Every structure is written in C-alpha cells, then in structure tokens.
Amino acid sequence: MKKLILTGIMLLMVLGVSGCRNNNDEANSIKVGYFNNVTHAQALLMKSEKSLENTFGKDINVKWTAFNAGPAEVEALFAGDIDIGYIGPVPAISANVKSNGDVQILSGAAKGGAILIRREGAQISGVKDLAGKTVAIPQIGNTQHLSLLKLLEDSGLKPVTEGGNVTVSAVANADVANAMARGDVDAA
C-alpha cells in the first residue's frame, strides 16, 4: 500500500493511495482529512467550493473529516480512515519516516502559517517572557509543538517536562480562545 503526502513549510496536503479496496462504495470514494481553522484555509476553501467533487465528478463520493492536529490525522491515514489530508510539516515528515517511505512528501501548500499569540494582560512581549507561563498547542508532536520547543530552546527556556518553567498544554483549537479568556493559558 502506497501513501503520499504533499508538504509545505506550515501547512500540507496529504494524499494516500490505497492499493486495494474491499467494496464498490469505498472504491468510489475519497476520504479527506482537514483542520477546521483559518490557518488551513486552502482545505476549507476546497471543501466549501467542492473543488474535489468538481474535479473527480459525480461518480466519486468525497467524505470530509475534521481533525484537531496533524498527529491524529496521520493516525487516521495509517488506519485507512482517510485518503487525503491537509497537515503540517512535522507530522508529514514523521509519517514518512514511520512508514519507511510509503508515505511520500509531494508538495507545499503554504509558508509562515503559524504565529505565537498572547492573551490580553499576560505580560508577554517576547519569548523569554514565557517563563512561568502556560502555552497552548493543539497536540503533542505537531508543528506548533515542535516550533514552540525550538523557540524555547533558542531563548534558553525549557518546558516543565524537561525541568524548565514553561508549561506546555495540549488544548483543542476550538477551545483556545475560551482558555485564554479564562486565563487558563497565557499564549498559544
């Protein structure tokens, strides 16, 4: 079974091609994974404009599934739950390595799609100010997580799990604004 991934700096399209299908319904469908947030606007646009449906025609049923972050989407790809997906570079590279090359990186989709934001009143004006703070990420092992770890390292900081003083907390994308408003997290 061959799996393919389209990759970019911050956002990626994953294309999985299964070698065998068991029934006609599955053979006539494409299962698409995506993130339901603005940082993955290309996939949202494809879904809203029915780009895949228009490209493949009425004989192909396109099924869309939303994911919170890349690692969960890669698991779905490996499980055969999706054929195509839009993910970040770290999960794409991880999938390529884990699959011994069966997942191939094909193409970039965007550049510079991740930023670090702070909640109002958090007293953060730079990375060093994250000391003693809580930072939300969508999922451990995704692009935002590894980008944050690199930012912390470059600033001489470490997460609490490595003996440092920055708490890194996995928070679903849809819950970040409320977590910030409650003061549960200081940055995301």
Question: Can you say where each PLM-predicted feature lies in the sequence?
Answer:
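Flexible hinge/capping segments at coil-to-helix
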Residues: 119-135, 159-161
